[in-house]
Structure formats: C-alpha cells, structure tokens
C-alpha cells in the first residue's frame, strides 16, 4: 500500500506539470495533467507516440467526466456506469470539449474509471489524468517499476510506487454508441 503522503506529493507534482509513472490494473502507466499542453506533449515525446493517436483519460469516478455527458443518451450512461470502476475503456464523442492533444484526430475520446486504489486516490486529488502504458512506442508495456526505470530513466519526473492490480491484459476498449469491442482486454 502506498502512503497517502506519497500520493499527495505525486498530485502536487502533476499540478506543477510533471509526467509520472504509476501502477495500474495490468501494466505501469505514464500520466500527467490533461489540461497541461506542455506536459502532454512531453509525455508523447517520451513515448515517441504521435499526437494523432489520442490518449486515454482516467478518473476515480464517473462524475469527473460529467462535463462530457450533457447530451448523452441514458443508455450510454448506463453502459458506462455498469462497467465502472473497472478495466473497461469507452470511446465516447468528445463534442469538441477537449483539446486535440488529448483526442488526436478522433471524434471520440477514450475514458476509464479505474479501480486501482492508488490511482483512484491520485485522481480524487487532481481530477482526470492522461493515462498511457509505460513503454516507448513498439516496446512491451512495463510490468515492473524496474522496467519503467530502464525505459525512462532521466525522462520522467517521478514514479509513484505500488503494485499492479493483478490483471494480465490491458482494459477492453469499446465504442459507446455500438458496444463494439475495439480492443480485447
């Protein structure tokens, strides 16, 4: 279990523009403040990930995404609520409410309410976070803190310790309108 003090320090660092690594349900993640354009572009550069691909936003509860849901059908809200918190990512229309550095070239944005206790505590303090697997493009996702440090030594601002959530696969990604699985979990 990670101490609350360490989570609070990570939250403070993120608010100051840091890119950090942290454990998630299945693999280590990299994250930053989604509203900090400079931090997001730095994260993309660290991973060698094109901005056009878009990024996932994670939160500790569905209310952190309410600003996106104003005109959503009840069916969509029910779909998300029935799978969260948990390893389910939904592609939802962003309605031009999010910047391109989050959405890439897509009409949708990927959202997930995490059930990892450390990451939930972090999101409760800072709000939604960018979350992407901790690996350079084309390399396997980090499953240990050691691998994170090997991949990103000197490039990221910190590592929030802790254990992975025990899942073997990343979250399933589904389209909210159709329910179609875009990536198996």
UniProtKB/Swiss-Prot annotation:
Residues 4-185 form the YrdC-like domain. GO terms for molecular function: ATP binding; double-stranded RNA binding; L-threonylcarbamoyladenylate synthase; tRNA binding. Coiled coil: none annotated. It catalyses: L-threonine + hydrogencarbonate + ATP = L-threonylcarbamoyladenylate + diphosphate + H2O. Keywords: ATP-binding, Cytoplasm, Nucleotide-binding, Nucleotidyltransferase, Transferase, tRNA processing. Its EC number is 2.7.7.87. PANTHER family: SUA5, THREONYLCARBAMOYL-AMP SYNTHASE. This is Threonylcarbamoyl-AMP synthase. It comes from Pseudomonas savastanoi pv. phaseolicola (strain 1448A / Race 6). The gene is tsaC.
